[in-house]
């Protein structure tokens, strides 16, 4: 048990050194880092060591949110069926990062006291990965950073873009 904690500490610090050295465009005193084993809450929120982290610049469907997917098309008539897109978004994120080492670079906190962050698993930007695969959308109200990933997912009809859905912010407003 003690050796596992030492190994986790060493791996985290080595990863932090690599991470910080690869971001030489950011002054070290401005970089605020949270790192550790990720625990997925939903498609855009995680916990690391009890700290709640909301992914910067993206918005995933709510856990109970349903979306529509084409089911059958006959001539010019199309039938669709509901599917649990919010739960799928959460499950895909869990498969990718749950119980894995993450490094999150945060800038501020929101009104719910969550850290707003970009998170990385190895060299993969998880925020970008969620949007590029269609499990979340770019949250343009706060940032345009992930718009190109959204355009790609939409063009390729990935995830949410394979059917129709209500934008997460509209769903929250109506439910």
Residue ranges and their predicted role:
Residues 2-175:
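Small beta-barrel nucleic-acid-binding modules, primarily SNase/OB-fold domains
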């Amino acid at each position: 048990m003690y050796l596992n904690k030492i190994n986790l500490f060493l791996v985290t610090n080595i990863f932090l050194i690599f991470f910080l050295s690869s971001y030489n465009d950011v002054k070290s005193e401005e970089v605020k880092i949270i790192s550790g084993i990720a625990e997925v809450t939903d498609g855009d929120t995680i916990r690391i060591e009890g700290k709640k982290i909301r992914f910067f610049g993206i918005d995933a469907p709510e856990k109970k949110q349903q979306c529509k997917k084409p089911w059958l098309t006959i001539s010019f008539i199309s039938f669709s069926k509901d599917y649990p897109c919010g739960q799928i978004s959460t499950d895909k994120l869990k498969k990718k990062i749950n119980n894995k080492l993450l490094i999150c670079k945060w800038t501020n906190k929101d009104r719910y006291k969550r850290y707003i962050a970009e998170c990385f698993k190895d060299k993969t930007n998880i925020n970008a990965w969620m949007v590029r695969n269609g499990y979340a959308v770019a949250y343009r109200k706060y940032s345009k950073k992930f718009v190109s990933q959204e355009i790609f997912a939409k063009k390729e009809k990935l995830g949410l873009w394979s059917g129709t859905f209500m934008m997460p912010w509209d769903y929250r407003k109506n439910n």
